[in-house]
Amino acid sequence: MVLVPVLPERNRAKAADLHAPDDRLGETVGLAQAIDLDVRDAQVVSLATVRPGALFGSGKIEEIETSVAVHEIGIVIVDHALTPIQQRNLEVAWKTKVLDRTGLILEIFGRRAQTREGRLQVELAHLTYQRGRLVRSWTHLERQRGGFGFLGGPGESQIETDRRIINDRIDKIKRELETVVRTRSLHRAGRRKVPYPVVALVGYTNAGKSTLFNALTGAGVHAEDQVFATLDPTMREIRLSSGRRIILSDTVGFISNLPTTLVAAFRATLEEVINA
C-alpha cells in the first residue's frame, strides 16, 4: 500500500514536497515497484492537521487499518518523512511494516549499488538513518517479547552498544570515502591538463541518461527502464560531429525530496557534476 499525505496548507511552506499529489502518488508507486513490491492500494490522504504521534488522525488510521486487513497488506509506504515514534505507532496500529520515503529510497539504492564506492555511500546513508531509529527498534522488540515471550529485548545498555558500533562504522566509512574524494580530485586535476571539457548528463532518474550515454559513446553502461539504475559515474571520451573532443559523464539521477543523508553520502559522486 502506498499513502501520499497532503499536509494542511499552513504546513506546506515547511513541507519537503510541494509537488502535485497525483504526481507524488505516481512517483511513489514507481519507487515501490522498483523493489518488486506488488502495490495493491494507493491513495492520496489529505490531512486536516498533522498529528505528532502518528502523522494521521485516529479516524484515518482506523480506515487504513481496515484496508490493510482487507487487502492483506504486508508493507505500507508513506511518502513523507516519519519520526521514529510515528513509524512505531503506525506499525503497532496497522500490524504491519511501515516504510517512509527515506527508507524506501535507501532500499532501492541498496539494491542498485554495484561498485565498492557505491556500496559504501549507500551504507553510510543507511547507518545514519538507522542510528536515529535505535530506540524505535528497541521498543518494537520489547513489544514482541511481551507478546510472545521468546524474543529478549535489549536494555538501554544494548542500545548504547549498538549506537557505538554504528558510530564506529560510520567513522570508518567516512574515512574511506575521504580517500575516494581525494582520488577523484586527483583524477579531475589530471583531466584539467587535457584540453577536453567535461560534460555531465544531468536529469531526473529514469529519464534516459544512460541510454543517451550509450548511444553517444557505445560504452554499454547498464541502462534499464527503472529508477536509479545508475549510481556510479562513468566517463568516456567522445568526438562530436564538429570534430571537437569532450569527456562525457553519466551520473546518478535526481528525484524530488532526495533524503539529505543520501545527498551527503553521495558527495564524491555529485562533485563530478559540480565540476563538469
Residue ranges, per PLM feature:
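A residue-level signal for conserved active-site and pocket-lining positions in enzyme catalytic cores
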Residues: T28, L127, I166
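Conserved G1/Walker A P-loop phosphate-binding module
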Residues: R10, H140-A276
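N-terminal accessory targeting/assembly segments
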Residues: M1-E107
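Conserved phosphate/pyrophosphate-binding and hydrolysis machinery centered on Walker-type P-loop NTPases
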Residues: L18-P21, A54-S58, H80-A81, A113, ...
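A charged, well-structured terminal subsegment
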Residues: L124, T128-E142
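Short, conserved glycine- and acidic-residue-centered signature motifs
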Residues: P21-R24, G57, L120, E224, ...
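Short alpha-helix plus adjacent loop in nuclease-associated cores
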Residues: G103-V122
